[in-house]
């Protein structure tokens, strides 16, 4: 059984280990190499996006479509397990948390395609969605524009890190030209890393974790996804300037410098479908 007592007991034991690390961030911000490295070093860790539910239920407005991919009983059990694990972690005397942030448009775009199956429920009603690239694109453009809850990404640190571990990244004054930041209170120590700078921070992450000779290992995620053709077509045709307002949201203005945010815009302006502001 997925949620057998023995399996949960072993997981809970790991959550209480002295050198335990919580990898806690919104999806698609580049944490896989950290997870892989911790596992290779036999450092107990737990990777989670939210302690409330499967992340997809927070991330998309078309929840009826999302629910078709999750068994009701398993989902209810999963939520109970998440709540139990959260309580265990909150009761620790001290906890180290690794979290990341990424260009918001890159985050949203990557996550949408990871969850692409959620948007093909309509394909059962319209066979052309599976046969014609332009029809498929128009369908996905509609889904991208209307079904993603963009507030989920902008509010993640308040809804998760602040609510569950009393770490408020917005209250602390930071130099947002730096590649990472640390936050601390009486129970939690957090390192917040810009995904774009992750590969150059081996020593800094190792120092935070008190791990000697820490070197990030490639997660070897497969690049040839089943959706690669429509992914490329979408990227060539979509007007990403519709999401440029995200760079002016409080979270991204706080964490990323003006120069970094302008560089993100410049990158997306190079895609053929994106219009100049």
Locate the predicted segments by residue.
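Membrane-interface amphipathic segments in extracytoplasmic regions
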Residues: 1-277
């Amino acid at each position: 059984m997925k949620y057998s007592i023995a399996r949960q007991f072993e997981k809970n034991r790991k959550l209480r280990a002295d050198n335990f690390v919580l990898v806690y961030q919104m999806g698609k911000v580049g944490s896989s190499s950290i997870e892989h490295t911790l596992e290779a070093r036999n450092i107990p860790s737990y990777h989670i996006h939210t302690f409330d539910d499967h992340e997809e239920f927070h991330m998309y407005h078309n929840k009826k479509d999302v629910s078709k991919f999750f068994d009701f009983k398993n989902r209810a059990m999963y939520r109970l397990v998440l709540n139990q694990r959260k309580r265990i972690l909150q009761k620790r005397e001290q906890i180290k948390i690794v979290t990341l942030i990424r260009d918001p448009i890159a985050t949203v775009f990557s996550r949408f395609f990871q969850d692409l199956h959620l948007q093909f429920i309509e394909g059962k009603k319209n066979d052309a969605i599976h046969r014609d690239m332009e029809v498929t694109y128009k369908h996905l453009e509609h889904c991208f524009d209307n079904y993603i809850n963009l507030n989920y990404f902008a509010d993640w640190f308040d809804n998760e890190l602040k609510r569950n571990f009393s770490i408020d990244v917005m209250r602390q004054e930071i130099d947002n030209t730096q590649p990472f930041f640390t936050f601390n209170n009486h129970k939690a120590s957090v390192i917040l890393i810009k995904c774009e700078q992750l590969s150059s921070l081996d020593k800094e992450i190792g120092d935070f974790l008190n791990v000697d000779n820490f070197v990030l290992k490639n997660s070897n995620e497969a690049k040839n996804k089943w959706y690669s053709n429509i992914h490329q077509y979408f990227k060539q045709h979509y007007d990403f300037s519709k999401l440029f307002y995200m760079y002016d949201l409080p979270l991204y203005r706080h964490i990323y410098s003006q120069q970094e945010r302008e560089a993100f815009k410049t990158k997306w302006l190079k895609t053929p479908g994106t219009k100049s502001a």
